[in-house]
Amino acid sequence: MSQPESYPLLSRIGSPSDLRELPAAELPALAGELRAFLLESVSSTGGHLASNLGTVELTIALHYVFNTPDDRLVWDVGHQSYPHKILTGRREAMPGLRKKGGLAGFPKRAESPYDTFGVGHSSTSISAALGMALAARQLGEDRHAVAIIGDGAMTAGMAFEALNHAGDQKANLLVVLNDNEMSISPNVGAMNNYLARLLSGKVYSTVREGSKRVLDHMPPMREFMRRAEEHMKGMIVPGTLFEELGFNYYGPIDGHDLPSLVKTLKNLRALPGPRLLHVVTRKGHGYAPAEQDPCGYHGVGQFDPSQGLAAGKTPSSPSYTQVFGQWLCDMAEADPRLVGITPAMREGSGLVEFSQRFPERYHDVGIAEQHALTVAAGMACDGLKPVVAIYSTFLQRAYDQLIHDIAIQNLPVLLAIDRAGVVGPDGPTHAGSFDLSYLRCVPNLTVMAPADEDECRRMLSTGFHLDGPAAVRYPRGKGPGAALDPGLDTLPVGKAQLRRKGRGVALLAFGAVLPAALAAAEPLDATVVNMRFVKPLDEALVREMAEGHDLLVTLEDNVVAGGAGSAVAESLAVQGITVPLLHLGLPDRFQEHGSREELLSEAGLDAEGILAAVRARLNDVPSRSGRDDCLSAPTRVISK
């Protein structure tokens, strides 16, 4: 990282109070240094880049005008909060960004008093800031609450619920709408079109402001014209939605014009009630490659800023996301009923090629997970075969729709659940720790977890051809490199696969933990079963394993509570079988950020951790099968 002399202004900012000591004339130069530091830092560590480059001036202006942390800034989603972290005393910690034990990639209350609300998912900021504004009013405290939300996040229903409540409460709340025409994928829908129309509403703005200046000198006319203005709005521009919700709307203004931002925010700080400031920014601003390709530079690994993101090497094996994307195109060619649905995650979920080849069958519904599942249910009612591509963590937002709109009606909707289990650097807000637990209890739902890429493809075909709802959950990144069969073959529903015959110990592996189970099985001489289906469970094979082994060990990259291991225990209890059990999975705590490998090792789900846990448990288990040698064998390191 460069020395302080490379950033003479930025190096003087240890907190926002230092920032507020600067003359306003120096703020543009500070913005240049902050943007350069961001590029140097994120290109070294990886992380979210384009969104942060786009919020440099806005972040400086907010901390310059408002008395943070007494005044509350609430960032929506939070991936654009790196400038905020840098200006609030965490500049020197940036080399540890998103690494185990280092800075979180999102605002985190435990990390800094300036992080007033923990975020990671979209569209929560207005609700949280409103809650803070209402708390201040009830407690008699004189402070401001500011929500900073993107135009993509504004498409979600929760944002409108909060706007509706805030307008009704006449709360002292400022909402800053950061309009960069992007979330992760390009924004879609009526809200995006509405904001575009506002941007072109220059005539209305000119007439309105000019009239106010004149009418200020004619008090008897002011009230008449106020009422007339409400009718004029609809004649000059589309109705100002935010004002109808009880907000005073200001803008749009240039989000990269620091003097204008500071002046406007100072004026708005002095006004009471609900206010909405519409600022227009450019994702990737100040770094040409990111401006030209904001999607590509949304989340980056390490790269050379002078070269930009190099064309990626062809991987030795595809990621699970790529396997899904190819399967979707293949199945779409085979079955014209297939439709693909995503809640604003076209790139992340692997739907780019599908959207290009089958545009009439591709539906990006915006950041609207609840709507995504219910619109899929409606399609399924009338003969289509919907496939919803969604991250595990975001599926949590649509749990009621899964039960009420899909499962109760037993509709043939396939959920392709990406980023299941341990995810890594994005931390607890993006971990897929809970899906097996909350899915397997839903009646009518078939739940599958592939152990490799080819099995993922076969499970997707299996779920697609079922007459009811199905879910296939797969992890982030690449699998073990299994050869892919180009066909669209299915698997027998509810049948596990015996992968290794051993004695004494049976390892029942669900999904991506299978390679680690196979590695741990060698020194144990353990039996290994690839369980494949969490629901319906292969109860016959579970019974066979229980009757022929001293210890059953369940393995899953899901929380132990209520997960696949619990399904095995429940099955044995129903069958009246008593056998020693060991459940290995994610512990009863939220995953912190770190690499996937580090987090799996910490949870004891790598080969070494499995081996150690099994050996410790065997000390308390009597032998029925002569497996004493696995206890006395020296522990050895198993390569990952």
UniProtKB/Swiss-Prot annotation:
**MF GO annotations:** 1-deoxy-D-xylulose-5-phosphate synthase activity; magnesium ion binding; thiamine pyrophosphate binding
Tell me the residue numbers annotated for binding Mg(2+).
Answer: D151, N180
Its Gene Ontology biological processes? Answer: 1-deoxy-D-xylulose 5-phosphate biosynthetic process; isopentenyl diphosphate biosynthetic process, methylerythritol 4-phosphate pathway; terpenoid biosynthetic process; thiamine biosynthetic process
InterPro entries hit by this protein = Dxylulose-5-P_synthase, THDP-binding, Transketo_C/PFOR_II, Transketolase-like_Pyr-bd, Transketolase_BS, Transketolase_C, Transketolase_CS
Which Pfam families does the record match to this protein? DXP_synthase_N, Transket_pyr, Transketolase_C
Q: How is the cofactor bound?
A: Binds 1 Mg(2+) ion per subunit. Binds 1 thiamine pyrophosphate per subunit.
- Put simply, this protein is called 1-deoxy-D-xylulose-5-phosphate synthase
Annotated EC: 2.2.1.7
Q: In which pathway does it act?
A: Metabolic intermediate biosynthesis; 1-deoxy-D-xylulose 5-phosphate biosynthesis; 1-deoxy-D-xylulose 5-phosphate from D-glyceraldehyde 3-phosphate and pyruvate: step 1/1
Subunit-structure text: Homodimer.
Instruction: Kindly list the organism's lineage.
Output: Bacteria, Pseudomonadati, Pseudomonadota, Gammaproteobacteria, Chromatiales
Protein origin, superkingdom: Bacteria
Q: Does the keyword Magnesium apply?
A: yes
What PROSITE patterns does this protein map onto? TRANSKETOLASE_1, TRANSKETOLASE_2
Residue positions annotated to bind thiamine diphosphate are H79, G120, H121, S122, G152, A153, N180, Y287, E369
Q: State what this protein does.
A: Catalyzes the acyloin condensation reaction between C atoms 2 and 3 of pyruvate and glyceraldehyde 3-phosphate to yield 1-deoxy-D-xylulose-5-phosphate (DXP).
Enumerate the cofactors the protein uses. Answer: Mg(2+); thiamine diphosphate
Q: What cellular component GO annotations does this protein have? A: cytosol
**Species name:** Thioalkalivibrio sulfidiphilus (strain HL-EbGR7)
Protein family according to the UniProt entry? Belongs to the transketolase family. DXPS subfamily.
**What reaction(s) does this enzyme catalyze?**
D-glyceraldehyde 3-phosphate + pyruvate + H(+) = 1-deoxy-D-xylulose 5-phosphate + CO2
